[in-house]
């Protein structure tokens, strides 16, 4: 896939944006397991949570009314949380009010769909459009389309067939996931691919209709992420000013390839003689099990390689301090087995840091190889170590790549830009949908 396909898609969406200008929509965002209120890096909390939260924020800033429906996973959660101006988070009672792994949520989807449908019927004005996130949310959106005639678009965030090819028997989702995804691609009014590879996988593995797939990437918020002077960031985090620091940030699950980064940093130290430290940010501290097991495995990997003293596992961190972590690093590394998009490389670019990323999924579209960083094969720690060593030897190259990445992120990957593209897609879908009454602001 050519790097400029994302930019070309963005230009098309920008041309459509005039259709959305001035039209206030009532938008229902379905995100069954990924609440916008969850702490990034906690169990089952990653890019989809950020996507839903930032999309809702920017749509509301543009004047739209947004309800986000997510499963109630704690008894103290209020049914309706007035989160920000014109954004409500609706906690849906479906299954027990506690954490349930998303792989085990399929039996609760019918209850989720029934509740959302009843809630929608009780509203003083109908929703204009539904935006589903993940395949189980798509099932809810399809129920709303059948029951209430609401058009829906869907962002899958990950595809079952791609996951199964990458993980094999380690994939614990029910096998009917793939059948459901194929049916949703036929039923959706528009399918949102996050990168050219995502669209290619939909067409090749599912037979999705090309004409109904729109490429819209993920993004970052300039209000949240910007370059901080490295000495200042390191001082706040208690980091040595003189060391070469590699950052990895994300969920602690095997497919993220954190072990490859640990192995690469070990090679960087032992083979290239670089005084390198690895920061691993993310991971749940709530005792839900999966993240804890992976964290223990990763600690063991570091110990076996003799670099345990040079790897710091910070656990999950508030988003307000992430710019310090990005800015404190010399380079950001991300080597997943597969990645539908990959928000963290874009966030690192926004903080003017070079990225060494696996040549998979969205990363091979966002990282301009040789310009904003380097692309390497996934599960290849030697290739990773080679690129890290090159950046260590040539700090001026690292600085130039970071600056180029910052420009690229600001030009193509802000959440405001993403939301404008999606609002244009909504408008395009609604060209053939029923007329709607003027929207009224939600009561506080």
Tell me the role of every PLM-derived stretch.
Residues 2-89, 442-444:
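N-terminal subdomain of nucleotide-sugar transferases
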Residues 197, 219:
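Carbohydrate-associated surface elements
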Residues 226-239, 245:
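A short helix/loop element that forms part of the nucleotide-sugar donor recognition site in Leloir-type
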Residues 291-316:
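Nucleotide-activated donor-binding/catalytic signature segment of Leloir-type glycosyltransferases, i.e.
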Residues 324-329:
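Short alpha-helical donor nucleotide-sugar binding micro-motif in glycosyltransferases
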Residues 337:
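Aromatic "clamp/platform" in nucleotide-sugar-dependent glycosyltransferases that forms part
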Residues 354-357, 367:
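Short hydrophobic beta-strand element within catalytic cores of glycosyltransferases
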Residues 369-370, 374-381, 390-395:
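Conserved acidic donor-binding segment of nucleotide-sugar-dependent glycosyltransferases
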């Amino acid at each position: 896939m050519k790097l400029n396909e994302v930019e070309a898609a963005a230009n098309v969406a920008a041309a459509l944006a005039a259709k959305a200008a001035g039209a206030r929509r009532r938008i229902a965002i379905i995100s069954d397991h990924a609440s916008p209120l969850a702490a990034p890096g906690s169990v089952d909390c990653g890019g989809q949570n950020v996507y839903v939260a930032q999309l809702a924020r920017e749509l509301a800033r543009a004047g739209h009314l947004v309800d986000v429906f997510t499963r109630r996973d704690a008894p103290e959660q209020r049914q309706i949380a007035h989160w920000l101006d014109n954004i409500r988070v609706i906690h849906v009672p479906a299954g027990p009010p506690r954490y349930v792994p998303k792989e085990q949520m399929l039996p609760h989807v019918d209850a989720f769909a029934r509740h959302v449908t009843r809630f929608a019927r009780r509203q003083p004005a109908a929703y204009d459009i539904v935006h589903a996130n993940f395949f189980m949310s798509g099932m809810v959106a399809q129920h709303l389309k059948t029951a209430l005639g609401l058009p829906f678009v869907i962002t899958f965030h990950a595809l079952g067939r791609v996951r199964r090819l990458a993980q094999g028997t380690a994939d614990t989702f029910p096998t009917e996931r793939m059948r459901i995804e194929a049916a949703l691609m036929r039923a959706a009014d528009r399918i949102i691919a996050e990168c050219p590879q995502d669209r290619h996988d939909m067409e090749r593995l599912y037979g999705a209709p090309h004409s109904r797939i729109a490429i819209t990437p993920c993004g970052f918020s300039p209000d949240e992420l910007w370059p901080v002077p490295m000495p200042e960031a390191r001082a706040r985090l208690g980091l040595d000013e003189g060391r070469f620091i590699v950052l990895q940030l994300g969920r602690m699950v095997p497919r993220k390839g954190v072990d490859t980064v640990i192995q690469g940093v070990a090679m960087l130290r032992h083979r290239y003689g670089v005084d390198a430290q690895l920061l691993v940010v993310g991971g749940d501290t709530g005792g839900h099990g999966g993240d804890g097991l992976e964290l223990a495995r990763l600690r063991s990997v570091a110990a076996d390689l003799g670099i345990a003293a040079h790897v710091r596992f910070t656990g999950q961190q508030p988003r307000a301090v992430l710019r310090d972590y990005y800015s404190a690093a010399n380079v950001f590394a991300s080597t997943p087995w597969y990645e539908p998009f990959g928000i963290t490389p874009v966030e690192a670019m926004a903080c003017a840091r070079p990225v060494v990323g696996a040549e998979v999924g969205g990363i091979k579209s966002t990282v301009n190889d040789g310009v904003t960083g380097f692309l390497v094969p996934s599960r290849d720690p030697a290739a990773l170590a080679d690129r890290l060593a090159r950046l260590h030897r040539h700090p001026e190259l690292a600085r130039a790549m970071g600056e180029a990445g910052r420009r690229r992120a600001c030009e193509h990957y802000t959440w405001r830009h993403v939301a404008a593209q999606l609002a244009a897609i909504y408008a395009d879908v609604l060209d053939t949908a029923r007329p709607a009454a003027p929207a009224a602001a939600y009561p506080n």
